[in-house]
Amino acid sequence: MNAPLTLHRSGAGPSSYSSHRPLITQQRLVGASSSIPSQFIHNEFSFEQYIKDHLNVKLDNDAQICPDYSERLQCPRGASCPRRHVRPSHLNFLPAGSTALRDPNKRTVCKHWLRGLCKKDDQCDYLHEYDMRRIPECRFYATFGFCNSGDDCLYLHVDPAIKRRECERYNRGFCPKGPLCTKKHVRRVACPLYLAGFCPEGLDCPRGHVKSTPASSASRSNSPIQTHRPLTAAEAFGTGTGRGDEYGDGAGMRNQRAPAGRYGLPSGGAAGGAGAADIGASRGGMGYANNMQRRPNNVFGAPAQGAQEGGRGWRKDLSEVLCFKCGEMGHFANMCPNPALPGNRGGVERGPGGQARQARDRPRPY
């Protein structure tokens, strides 16, 4: 009655035993499916409620829990309902915009989730919610004022006018720059208590506290608004050789000039560099080598010959340097001022020029 089906194969072959292998019938499949209880997805362990209430763990997603059962503890679909009939956690079915599920370690919005391309779901290390306060600012738009991605950029484009600071002079009562001021002029109603002599709210008062006296240097330094200029590199990292930026305008290096030496030439490193260049030029060097002769000293951060003590960085006396190209002392091989001198030029043998080269290149008779 329930004889197993057989598989008929066409063609001859030595493996005839596989043609009589029994197959699973449809009745056997029905019996196997009926052995699994239909209420298995609705079963709830006794420790699940403790995990949900005390450990604050969300065991089931909102899509897995039956909303009818969670509201009325009964479902018209009964055991055939495809969703679970369990008591939901307090983290389920939260209103839109709720921050109860927000992980404190996640502070940035996932840029892939904004396009619907994040595959990590709840395992993602970034926020899966649209929060403008947590979207990082576009570095290119903030630096250059435009972004090549345009509207497709996944980062925040902040208007530069919004990031302007408030004018501290206008907040005190008057700004001499008027509409030409680059800072924000926020209008506030004058505080009547402050005009009468005292305001108990102090700095927390939302109204304006008009002051007739100019701000002192001490008040500017203690003000919560940044009214002083930013620190220069010399002030932030300390002073040293070549740093004299007193006013923070970057003119420290330009204002420093070496004192005049002999024949009106600058003394110190400049004179030493110029002397080395003149030596190279007197030896038959090319014109471009005169200015480049001083480059090794600047590259390695050391002063030229004759420089004063106290400089920083690498030092090398040019009188001890031997050029491996021309064999002369006083310069490096990459700054050799004698390109026409015979010798080994980095593996290429250069012979004498002029008539000797013409005689060498002249075709010989048979």
From Swiss-Prot:
ZnF segments: C3H1-type: 60-88, 104-131, 132-160, 161-188, 190-212
Bias type Gly residues, positions: 344-354
Lyase listed as a keyword: no
Positions of region (Disordered): 1-20, 211-255, 343-366
GO annotation, cellular component aspect: nucleus
Subcellular location: Nucleus
Family assignment from sequence similarity: Belongs to the CPSF4/YTH1 family.
Protein name: mRNA 3'-end-processing protein YTH1
Species for this entry: Mycosarcoma maydis (Corn smut fungus)
